[in-house]
Amino acid sequence: MTSKPSNDRLHSYLDLQPEVAAALSQGRPVVALESTIISHGMPYPQNVEMARGVEQIVRDNGAVPATIAVLGGRLKVGLSADELELLATDKAVQKISTRDLPVTVALGGHGATTVASTMRIAALAGIRVFATGGTGGVHRGAGETMDISADLLELARTDVCVVSAGVKSILDIGLTLEVLETQGVPAITLGADEFPAFYSRRSGFSSPLTVQTPAEAARVLKVKWDLGLTGGVLLANPVPETAEIPAEEMETHITRALADMAALGLSGKDTTPYLLGRIVELTGGRSLETNIALVRHNAAAAAQVAAEYARLG
């Protein structure tokens, strides 16, 4: 069996922002935040405004924010204002998942982290709760393409709770839930019996598991990891009613975007950015507004879960 890297070896790659390092050493709640949504999910300056706003929401709900990225080959856990600006404006920043981490770090590159790579870096830093917009999953047509997000594998092996608005609605939600079940990953919806579909509160799929409060979610995390059950938890937090786009309307836009993508012959990691961008066009910008609203909503929930988890000791 391969031995785990020592703390000294990990420290040689990690840069913890002082506020984050202090919070972790004192057992205070910290919430990890991803960076792909900043560099590849929204235009400038909306991306910077959103990122700063989300960090403030985490603070307002009792936790310390730790936006994660790779800059100059360093695993950054918490970003300065200048680093956030670089991430939001530098076109050389690549979207990186776990497979890309060793190359980006070894070659001193810049990378915006996906859900999977953010989870991995958060775990290395000792952060247990992570807020994002939507989680990746099984793509539609995966029976032909085998396009399945690394997010699902990371959820199966990394001890981090991911708070999201469910899996992205451009994906095959039913098959994604099946894969999570096979991998032993609890897919839990906060305060609802139906699993959400990112832009929409309803997906048509019953939630495998449900909790009613952040405190209940925190207790689930503690028990899971106390029992030695390796792997993460997907905590689905439905988008606020005031910001949602009904599932029926979204399905029309998604079908059109998928057809346009097929005509262009896009595949691999180009698919999700294209589809999300095309849906922004098809919805006249409404989907971007919904995306921002759900990210903010998830940040608040994640901070509350992290605060409750820290109280459990």
Swiss-Prot record:
Active site per the UniProt annotation: 34 (proton donor), 168 (nucleophile)
Catalytic function, reaction form: D-ribose 5-phosphate + uracil = psi-UMP + H2O
Bound cofactor: record note: Binds 1 Mn(2+) ion per subunit.
Protein's GO biological process: nucleobase catabolic process
Superkingdom of source: Bacteria
Positions contributing to substrate binding: 95, 115, 149-151
InterPro entries on file: Indigdn_synthA-like, PsuG
Binding site for Mn(2+): 147
UniProt keyword ATP-binding, yes or no: no
Molecular function GO terms recorded: hydrolase activity, acting on glycosyl bonds; metal ion binding; pseudouridylate synthase activity
Entry similarity comment: Belongs to the pseudouridine-5'-phosphate glycosidase family.
Functional summary from the UniProt entry: Catalyzes the reversible cleavage of pseudouridine 5'-phosphate (PsiMP) to ribose 5-phosphate and uracil. Functions biologically in the cleavage direction, as part of a pseudouridine degradation pathway.
Protein name: Pseudouridine-5'-phosphate glycosidase
Organism: Deinococcus radiodurans (strain ATCC 13939 / DSM 20539 / JCM 16871 / CCUG 27074 / LMG 4051 / NBRC 15346 / NCIMB 9279 / VKM B-1422 / R1)
Gene: psuG
